[in-house]
């Protein structure tokens, strides 16, 4: 991904840094429904998720996370922008006439060939089970947790997990969060790293660009009134008046563990995420 710096012609473009434009060529059989950005409100109009609303209309692209076109080679035809995720997607034309979108692997270019199966080469973009001859230290993404359900782990832009061990019926992975976890060796994973690794280098440059993404302004609780937030009130710039910060509803914030206790998958986690 190439970062494009705007020419400083207006205040709004002075700090803008965006990636090179990747167009979308929609296929009717690979899109579904006309979706607006989530407004963060329920059927009664009550805010249930803050800082969301507005945004440009979107069409959902159907992504093939399962990679169940077994042993059929496919060719990358286009690399496209997807407004529903920060990673790019690429259109694959398979030998049997099937067309599908997949996550764009880093380094893949138009014309490359990919394939999924149990006896396929361990090369970028190919999908295969962890039980194959995949060497330790291999970079993978789009990893299944439940066999046949489709990839659920390491799907964001630049995400990559590492295969660090195999023992018995399980494989040990180091996830992008730092968590070390056991996964069934029969689960499918895609070789390589998700593309668009420089997504964090982008700078929107102005508030309007953030609004296009459906993200509304975030107001600090300390500048609110006491009726609106536990941190609010006081004369001038006052401290929060509590030992620890809290949410608008009084629950502990900034560091509290939100994972449920005694969850069924606790036995699969060897090291907690950082």
Swiss-Prot record:
Protein name per the record: Large ribosomal subunit protein uL2cz/uL2cy
NCBIfam families: rplB_bact (TIGR01171)
Gene Ontology MF terms: rRNA binding; structural constituent of ribosome; transferase activity
One GO cellular component term noted in the UniProt record for this chain: chloroplast
Subunit structure, as described in the record: Part of the 50S ribosomal subunit.
Sequence similarity: Belongs to the universal ribosomal protein uL2 family.
Record keyword Chloroplast present: yes
Matching PANTHER family: LARGE RIBOSOMAL SUBUNIT PROTEIN UL2M, RIBOSOMAL PROTEIN L2
Organism in which the protein naturally occurs: Dioscorea elephantipes (Elephant's foot yam)
Residue ranges of the region described as Disordered: 225-274
InterPro entries tied to this protein: NA-bd_OB-fold, Rib_uL2_dom2, Ribosomal_uL2, Ribosomal_uL2_bac/org-type, Ribosomal_uL2_C, Ribosomal_uL2_CS, Ribosomal_uL2_dom3, Ribosomal_uL2_RNA-bd_dom
Compartments, record wording: Plastid, Chloroplast
One of the Pfam families matching this protein, by short name: Ribosomal_L2
Keywords linked to the UniProt accession: Chloroplast, Plastid, Ribonucleoprotein, Ribosomal protein
Key word Ribosomal protein present: yes
Example GO biological process: mitochondrial translation
Signal peptide extent: none
């Amino acid at each position: 991904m190439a970062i494009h710096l705007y020419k400083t012609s207006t205040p709004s473009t002075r700090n803008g840094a965006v990636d090179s434009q990747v167009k979308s060529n929609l296929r009717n059989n690979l899109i579904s429904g006309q979706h607006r950005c989530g407004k963060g409100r329920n059927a009664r109009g009550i805010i249930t998720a803050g800082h969301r609303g507005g945004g440009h209309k979107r069409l959902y692209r159907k992504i093939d996370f399962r990679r169940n076109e077994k042993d059929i080679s496919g060719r990358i035809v286009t690399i496209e922008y997807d407004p529903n995720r920060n990673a790019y997607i690429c259109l694959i034309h398979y030998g049997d006439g099937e067309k599908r979108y997949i996550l764009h692997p880093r380094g893949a270019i138009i014309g490359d060939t990919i394939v999924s199966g149990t006896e396929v080469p361990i090369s970028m973009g190919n999908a295969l089970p962890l039980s194959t001859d995949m060497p330790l230290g291999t970079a993978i993404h789009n990893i299944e947790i439940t066999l046949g359900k489709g990839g659920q782990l390491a799907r964001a832009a630049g995400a990559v997990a590492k295969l660090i061990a195999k023992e018995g019926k399980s494989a040990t992975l180091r996830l992008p969060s730092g968590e070390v976890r056991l996964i069934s060796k029969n689960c499918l994973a895609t070789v390589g790293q998700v593309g668009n690794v420089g997504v964090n280098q982008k700078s929107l440059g102005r508030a309007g660009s953030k609004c296009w993404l459906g993200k509304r302004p975030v107001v600090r609780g300390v500048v609110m009134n006491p009726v609106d937030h536990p941190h609010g009130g006081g004369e001038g710039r006052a401290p929060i008046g509590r030992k620890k910060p809290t949410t608008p509803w009084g629950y502990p914030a900034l560091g509290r563990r939100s994972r449920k206790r005694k969850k069924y998958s606790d036995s699969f986690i060897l090291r907690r995420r950082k």
